[in-house]
């Protein structure tokens, strides 16, 4: 049986950061039937308002949520990307025989928030670890900035992303 390890990266990063800094992980993974999955933080090149204007919003800061603001909702659906699109590609195309594989998720910073939420909300993962997570994004500047753009004013943030 293969084991799936999803590494959810933090603010300002891309799907390449872990791969560049943790090459030993891939050697260990290949010896232990472990599949390392490195989803990106956000869509790239979507052309949404301000998505490349700041380091703490947009590209590099998708927060692994599904945006509801019409300016972002077409592209910023990172929760669905990981739990539906990416998972379907993994199971249907790359590893169709591994439907029962164990899945772990780990995240850092913004990715820690993503890991916790993906674990608690989706029920796809059997274990979760979060290192220095942005655990309460509506009460920190990075989360407030992102959520106000992805969802609108704070009273419009869906409770599924704040609880």
Model features per residue range: what roles?
Residues 1-163:
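Non-catalytic cap/lid and distal C-terminal segments of serine-dependent acyl enzymes
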């Amino acid at each position: 049986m293969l084991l799936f390890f999803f590494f959810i990266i933090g603010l300002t990063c891309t799907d390449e950061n872990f791969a560049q800094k943790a090459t030993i992980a891939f050697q260990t993974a290949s010896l232990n039937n472990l599949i390392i999955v490195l989803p990106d933080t956000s869509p790239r090149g979507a052309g949404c308002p301000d998505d490349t204007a700041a380091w703490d919003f947009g590209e590099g800061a998708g927060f692994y949520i599904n945006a509801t603001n019409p300016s972002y909702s077409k592209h910023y659906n990172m929760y669905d990307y990981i739990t539906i699109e990416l998972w379907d590609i993994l199971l249907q195309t790359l590893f169709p025989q591994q439907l029962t594989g164990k899945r772990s998720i780990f995240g850092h910073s913004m990715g820690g928030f993503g890991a916790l939420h993906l674990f608690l909300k989706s029920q796809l993962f059997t274990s979760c670890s979060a290192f220095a997570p942005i655990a309460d994004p509506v009460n920190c500047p990075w989360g407030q900035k992102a959520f106000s753009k992805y969802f609108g004013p704070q009273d419009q943030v869906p409770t599924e992303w704040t609880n």
